[in-house]
């Protein structure tokens, strides 16, 4: 099931040299903007 995550914030509690986020998306148009 798809979920609208617009307006949501994800917090990584501890910054390390190996902290990372994986994004998997199926898009019908190119992504024109993203903030991380």
UniProtKB/Swiss-Prot annotation:
Cofactor annotation: Ca(2+)
Record-level GO BP terms: protein homooligomerization; response to bacterium; response to lipopolysaccharide
Span of the signal peptide: none
Key words, A-Z: Amyloid, Calcium, Lectin, Metal-binding, Secreted
Localization per record: Secreted
Domain of life: Eukaryota
Transcription regulation found in the keyword field: no
GO cellular component, one term: extracellular space
Residue ranges annotated for the Pentraxin (PTX) domain, each copy included: 6-36
Cofactor: record remark: Binds 2 calcium ions per subunit.
GO molecular function, one term: pentraxin binding
Predominant subcellular localization, coarse grouping: secreted
Record-stated family: Belongs to the pentraxin family.
Subunit structure: Homopentamer. Discoid arrangement of 5 covalently bound subunits.
Protein name in UniProt: Serum amyloid P-component
Organism: Salmo salar
